[in-house]
């Protein structure tokens, strides 16, 4: 083992806070109060960081000895399970009446069940029959009566609920004589087959089809189950749905809502949610919380909003870290799916996570200018097929890193991700060129950075050793910057811009023009309100008031996707003539909505349009793009540094960066506005995210009367030394892992992480204010070490 010496980084560079100081770095982290160590430990133990995995032997032994599900063949027969599919690794058992499934790993005998197992361990009746019928069935159907359409009238029922099943016992166990089958045995003939029937067909070596006939409501549809090498998939095609009773309409389906659920605090693992950069909910504590969010953001076509940002169509449940778990991926149809999670509390003894596939959604039909109306349903269902896969994770793959690796491998197998990492640590250099400032009559152009200034700043950065620059020009048009996109190609200094493009291309670097064709505002001269602004499902214009802190509210517009596509097509020749790498899109990669345009169009139509737009360009940079844009992505901008910070989250983890590591370069939000100082830089190294700055030649005070006044510190002269020092500090770590993939990340002790890469490099990051020695490596306070 060779410990890399970072001798090129003098100690005086360690205080790389945005507020420059030349004090000794140890003074910056020294305790200022008597209980500083306690305060620091509380901070490092919070959900802003990743925590140490469960290591208590008694907890691990209890899980291994008492909660290791392994039914015998006789017990499976008694419960009605049939071995439907098998391969060299797995057995898949299926019980059709309840639509329940058990996946068995042949090597270990460990079973993952679609039912919440170990019911009744409190030795009392834990749930009433209605709740048990929901829990013990693997298919939930959401429906509504057509004469009573409202959110409160939605019915969520399982097959057992519809069949009015009842049980032989109340489900309580005698811990001295446990019978795992006891909570699930039905009373003879209690399942009403005249209300619902499930049949299987097309059974072969790797798949079978189930047909669900809900005679009570006049629903009939097919679901396919396919065994894969390391898991199984569920396929649902809405074209198979028949609705023969006009009194009822199908809204959505939940497949295996309790698959892999964890009881109370006995499972020493966690739930993985792709919220923001990544979040964990550890299953060793009670939360009494629920979580619900649409994938790929809110659908404003339904006036639905969500705080969460789910850019990846995946989730996971780890029963025991580095031993066993699973993860779920929506391969097709994620734009119509909602992530649902319930955690142990007053209403449930289980942690569970699942998806709901929405084939219809209620919306408000507005009938007058006052906004009066009624709730209605679309007559047509979403016709986008759904496919979700469940993949078993074992040994060192059973972790959030293993989930990132598995999902990355799936993306690579489908050619949905490309290997584009450079050979030197890149830095995004965004520059504000022009903005509009108010005058007595209208506005006038304010030039913050001329083309000559752009060249000068680039050259100085290269002299400071920053040779791999990703240049993003903001406000490059005469239109200005904030809220004025999509810009016209009116170029105040066309030749100067061409010269910049030629120099950047000659250096083998990238230059993007920031442009937004999907989201605009009342300030854009290129948008006509009546023609271009989309209508939502309620036929209202998608114009929303943005209240700003400076009391200058703006009406933000969402355009028809077809209009956005047409405007991009009109600009293709212009951007190619300039020689730009492509466009940098703020919203194209993260905004999907349903809309009305003489007919109602759902998110699939929008998704197809925006991906077609991205495919028309040879290269794209995007801010916080969702997974559907990864095949067309060259640079990921504005990587979130946190999640939505809900109080049920226990850990912050780099799920999204690790999915992209080794393939797509990712960049942090602008470090000009870094309020976390050294901690933020260490997190960038820990998460493998590259630096980013927003710069101007003129002082940012020039922007004070413009809509860009939120950029309160941008002058290159103010940041020149910080940029040089911060880049050198970060690149001294990231240079060694370019093109490498993450093998493992572990928290050795609170505030100290170790990240191992497939090229043999290991990074140690110490978030503590005191030196730490681990693996015979001493890491200075608030610092890192690289081991080759």
Q: Predicted regions span which residues?
A:
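Carbohydrate-recognition beta-sandwich/jelly-roll modules
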Residues: 83-450, 455-468
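Aromatic-lined carbohydrate-binding/catalytic grooves of carbohydrate-active enzymes
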Residues: 421-502, 509-566
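Glycine-rich, histidine-containing beta strand-loop boundary motifs that form or position
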Residues: 89, 96, 237-238, 257, ...
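Active-site-proximal substrate-binding groove within the catalytic cores of carbohydrate-active enzymes
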Residues: 87-89, 94, 98-107, 311, ...
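Structural alpha-beta junctions
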Residues: 231-233, 260-264, 465-466, 506-509, ...
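Sec-dependent N-terminal signal peptides of Gram-positive bacterial secreted proteins and lipoproteins
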Residues: 4-22
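Intrinsically disordered, low-structural-confidence terminal and linker regions
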Residues: 21-71
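Short acidic catalytic loops
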Residues: 218, 233-234, 468-477, 511-517, ...
